[in-house]
Amino acid sequence: MPRNLFPLLYLVVLLAASHARAADPLDDYLSLDLQELLSLEVTSVARKKQRISESAAAIFVITRDDIRRSGVTSIPEALRLAPGIQVARIDANKWAISSRGFASQFANKLLVLIDGRSVYTSTYAGVYWEVQDVLLEDIDRIEVIRGPGSTIWGANAVNGVINIITRPATESVGTLVSVGAGNEEQLVALRQGFALDQGGAGRVYAKFNRRESSYSPDLNGEAGDDWDKTQMGFRVDLALSEQDSLTLQGDAYQANENQVLREFILDPADPANLPPDPQHPFLIPFLPDAFESEGYNLLMRWVRDAGDRQNNLQVYFDHSDRQEQVLRQRVDTFDIDFTQNIKLGRRNELVWGLGYRRIGDDFDNTFRTIFYQDPQIQELYNLFVQDEFAWREDLKLTAGIKWEHNDYTGTETQPSLRLLWAQDARHAWWLAASRAVRTPSRLETNSSIAAYQLPPDPADPVYYPSPGVVRLEGNPETKSETLNAFELGYRWHLDEGISLDLTLFHNRYSDLVTFEATGSLSFQVPNPLNPGEWFYPPNSLTYDNLRDATSQGAELSLDWQAHENWRLRANYSWLDLSADVDDNSTDAFGDTVLKGSSARYQWSLRSQHSITPELSMDLWIQHVDALSRSGFSRPRSIPAHTRFNLRMAWQKDDLELSLVAFNLLKDRHSEFGAENIFVYTDVERSVLATLRWDF
């Protein structure tokens, strides 16, 4: 994406602002009672519109007003608002986000969508969170499903689905200018919305944000992970007829990111790599890495609503280009998806759909990371059907199944069965049993990674005279990881303005990926993943599926409208995760990291208080239990920590001025270990002042 396009779009937005129309006032969800909030419609559970109270799934909605009043400036930070979602900042531009365990930078059991467009990367099996962005003011809601959603959304929707849904362009006619500055972050955003003929509308936006470097205990100072990103985009909504509507939208971004690599392994065959350390001659203790990432996407959605039948056709293309020292990659994704919703009488409703996805990737191989079969094309085909049958007015049964074919493991089957009982106007119960799979990534099937370097053998310099590198080799026979999940949910609502949402779950995982040795050397060396321990290093490692796991837990959210201008919300989640490795496995460290990276419990409390029509105050406190071994390549024990944020805002007509203080309790704290080979970092206290003009 040429850089000169970004300032050009800024100019276009500024010129368009001179023709601004009046904008709708900010939504005030405090004016809604809890019954109305429970009646908010969601679409991610069943690929159709339904109220939260009618959903047989553990779903939570983060509203636009929740995001605004929290003061957060990114999608990852907004996800801290949801119960059962573990969000940990690894450094200034990386996060570990997961649902119901298995936290890591690339949490491979969580599917993330933006307006139905998957941002899950098949390279690592996860999400590059720092480049997943939209204009936060244009988000309508974030639908967070905890638990499997694979019958509807396919493979990798194992432990949860996050769908970030933006507002129609008809709801953003007018001009928005937002500017923020603080000791850790600076941002500016511009958006112009305009009306079109026959009830249509469009908008364009541009935004820039920069985050300063965090603190690194490894470096005893700045972590060298500062970054900035420029993004622009558009959306057009057209009413083609009384039944047909068309949406066109797209985004483009360019990010300049920095990171410091710890113990980076150089190519010993390269004469330019001089040996600074006789014991580790090709190992650089700290290597700064400045790189660019850029990408764009285009999406088209056509909807025909004929009353008892609705058709939905969505097509998108996504391009990303990422040039790190660790891995240089370019990925293109084309996806087409068709869904039809049919009402079969008064009690029966059928949803079915089919889809095709083509992923093309290309890598610049380095000594550290090699991809075989480069470039490669992957193709996926899927078909699903789901039927909802109302036995009685208060009892609904939903049964569905999805077939999906991929190039790695062939055809995968993912069924689900859900039952909802609306006991009365105040009480509702639901049950669910589901099967979901996580398909292997490109990395796990046909790659080679320089995992760590070994020192020479002091006892036998003839047999092993020089340092060696242990490589992790991909395995084309890697199987899909499988989950069988069982859930029980309960919702309770009182007229006095109190609601409760409780979910219990039991998950059984099989064929989880392990790291297996292919032979071992004759001498012991320090274990790079467990300091203080020694082990016989392998000649090389490879992937296999020799681990099973079990988890159970509870997730609770409480909502109390204490007064017409004061609302309290509390969340609590508890998780117990255990794993068993096959007797034939040589994986010596996976279980420790698997269990140690997920918080056993966490809780939060939020207070939203509109003191006067112009002045509001929001308090948010969150506590996360200790992590015994978080991060894979460089695990780290993380003490329990408590975050406390305070936001004060003054609003007059179209103008809002806010001041947010983040992490008030401590100067800095740790949240996660180091993924890959990055240095440890801490999250620091920060303040941010924002001025927003929406007219």
Where are these regions (language model features)?
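Short acidic/polar hinge/loop motifs at secondary-structure boundaries
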Residues: S118-R146
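Membrane-embedded beta-barrel scaffold of Gram-negative outer-membrane proteins
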Residues: D308-Q323, A422, A428-W430, V462-P465, ...
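Conserved C-terminal beta-signal and adjacent last beta-strands/turns
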Residues: G193-A195, A239, L431, V593-F695
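Face-selective signature of the C-terminal outer-membrane beta-barrel domain
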Residues: A239-A255, L287-T411, L420-D424, I498-L504, ...
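Gram-negative outer-membrane beta-barrel transporters
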Residues: A390-D394, F505-Y509, P528-G631, T690-D694
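Periplasmic-side early beta-strands and strand-to-turn transitions of outer-membrane beta-barrels
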Residues: T151, N163, T170-S172, R191-F291, ...
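Structural signature of Gram-negative outer-membrane beta-barrels, strongest in the C-terminal barrel
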Residues: S241, R347, D374-S510, Q608-E614, ...
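Extracytoplasmic beta-strand/coil segments of soluble accessory domains associated
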Residues: T43-F60, P76-S118, D140
